[in-house]
UniProtKB/Swiss-Prot annotation:
Belongs to the MntP (TC 9.B.29) family. InterPro entries: Mntp/YtaF, Put_MntP. It is found in: Cell membrane. It is a multi-pass membrane protein. Keywords: Cell membrane, Ion transport, Manganese, Membrane, Transmembrane, Transmembrane helix, Transport. The chain crosses the membrane at residues 3-23, 36-56, 65-85, 103-123, 126-146, 163-183. One of its GO terms (cellular component) is plasma membrane. It comes from Methanothermobacter thermautotrophicus (strain ATCC 29096 / DSM 1053 / JCM 10044 / NBRC 100330 / Delta H) (Methanobacterium thermoautotrophicum). The gene is mntP. The keyword Zinc does not apply. The lineage of its organism: Archaea, Methanobacteriati, Methanobacteriota, Methanomada group, Methanobacteria. This is Putative manganese efflux pump MntP. Probably functions as a manganese efflux pump. GO terms for molecular function: manganese ion transmembrane transporter activity.
Length: 184
């Protein structure tokens, strides 16, 4: 596989993590820039690890995962998105609270499609290591940039944009569901 193809796959896989980083960045303050780095590391690590797991797992697990993964991603993103909307509309303005558990859930939900990419690499007999490095680095960079973009925009519009961030998560979950589930 050529480098351009790897980069395009990496960018495609990183877009959900980028969008989530922007939405979570909306609630950040300058003193919380460590969150941007930690979340970028988490998203990058999971985007890199999932293709390896998919590559190792091969076809048998793909049948099960391909049926359940879109639903799991949708439900996780829906719950977190609704929580963000609720907190922005109902609760008084609060400081952003960093949650490793929430970050883990978001990292897993956004990297499920990377698992399928890994299975595809195995079926096509493509070496996994260089694509994984490219995918992980691109996701890290775009997630870090997304957090900073969200933080900058959030200061302009205040914390009410967290509702928009929640809506973005729900729409990402819906997109994952619609792209991967046949309703016929």
């Amino acid at each position: 596989m050529d480098l351009l193809s790897m980069v395009l796959i990496g960018v495609g896989l990183a877009m959900d993590a980028f969008s989530i980083s922007v939405s979570r960045g909306l609630a950040l303050h300058e003193s919380e820039t460590n969150y941007a780095l930690i979340s970028a590391l988490s998203f990058g690590t999971f985007q890199a690890a999932m293709p390896v797991l998919g590559w190792v797992s091969g076809l048998e697990i793909q049948r099960l995962v391909s049926a359940l993964a879109p639903w799991a991603a949708f439900i996780l993103l829906l719950i977190i998105g609704l929580k963000m909307i609720y907190e922005s509309l109902i609760m008084e303005e609060e400081e952003f609270i960093f949650s490793y558990r929430e970050l883990l859930v978001l990292s897993i939900a956004t990297s499920i499609d990377a698992f399928a990419v890994g299975v595809s690499f195995a079926l096509l007999d493509i070496s996994i290591w260089l694509p994984v490095i490219v995918i992980g680095l691109i996701t890290f960079i775009l997630s870090l940039a997304g957090s900073y973009i969200g933080e900058r925009v959030g200061h302009i519009f205040e914390n009410r944009l967290e509702a928009l961030g929640g809506l973005i998560l729900i729409l990402i979950g819906l997109k994952i569901l619609l792209e991967n589930v046949s309703f016929t």
